[in-house]
Amino acid sequence: MIVVVGQFRFAPERMDEARAVMRKVIAATRSEDGCIQYNYGEDVLDPGLIRVSELWHSRAQLHAHMQTPHMATWQSERVALGLSERSIAVYEAGDGTAL
């Protein structure tokens, strides 16, 4: 399983616009082959900070995701919205156990 975690930031005054754009990319991505989870969450204590968490069946499927038209659109829209402080990492995980 592939785990993607990270964060990025929008100016708090741009968050209404950013939410509309994020909803589109999240909905499209969740329907992709190999996507187990795809989530963006707003930090409650830090306005404008978005936490990213994704789970994919394979690196190949994650790579295919990065080549989709909706990701190309997201990449240009997020720049236009002033995305900053982007930090995303990819990990390979073994079998998980419940806490």
Language model segments and positions:
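Glycine-rich beta-strand-turn "strand-cap" elements at beta-sheet edges
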Residues: Y40-D46, W74-L99
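A general secondary-structure boundary signal
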Residues: V5-F8, M15, T29-G34, P47-L49, ...
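Residue-level signal for well-ordered alpha-helical positions
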Residues: V21, G41, H65-T68, E77
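Short histidine/acidic/glycine/proline-rich micro-motifs that form metal-
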Residues: R9-F10, D95
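Short amphipathic alpha-helical segments
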Residues: R14-I36, H70, W74
